[in-house]
A protein has these predicted regions:
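N-terminal accessory beta-strand-rich subdomains and adjacent acidic, glycine-rich linkers
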Residues: 1-146
């Protein structure tokens, strides 16, 4: 069952577009970054199409043989679920494992910049998008800011 609505996010500047979407299993999938696209260009049309298993990929779910985290362009990579890229974080989970699976939980749009104490901050932004990811097993959350 697909409990995640395959929503997409589009961030435009005067000259560039950045698109990503929520995959059917809840992962944030990078779709496009480059020259400014027309308003008619949608993430679902530009996203990678998968119909067969790629090489010796690890299946993420028995419900979809072609869905493999290692062959997807992801906004966030996890440990221990078949994505072999370097993860931006490593958590020791409450059960002692290092396995994580962060999926979309919610998002908010904030007016202006969201300052982060002790970190460099952007200035002059019209809006800031915050996406919250939640681990599928443990109540651990990550916020991504765009």
């Amino acid at each position: 069952m697909n409990k995640h609505k395959e929503a997409s996010f589009r961030l435009d500047t005067d000259h560039t577009s950045y698109l990503f979407r929520i995959s059917k299993f809840g992962h944030l999938e990078h779709v496009y970054y480059g020259s400014l696209l027309s308003k008619d260009d949608k993430a679902e049309f530009l996203s990678q199409k998968r119909s067969i298993q790629v090489g010796s990929s690890i299946h993420y779910s028995k419900d979809d043989d072609a869905y493999s985290l290692d062959s997807m362009c992801l906004e966030w990579s996890d440990n221990g679920r078949g994505d072999y890229r370097q993860s931006p974080s490593e958590f020791i989970m409450p059960d002692g494992s290092f396995v994580s699976d962060f999926i979309y939980d919610s998002h908010e749009v904030h007016e202006g910049c969201v300052p982060m104490k002790g970190l460099p901050t952007a200035y002059g932004a019209n809006q800031t998008l915050r996406i919250t990811l939640k681990d599928k097993v443990f109540p651990i959350y990550i916020d991504l800011y765009y």
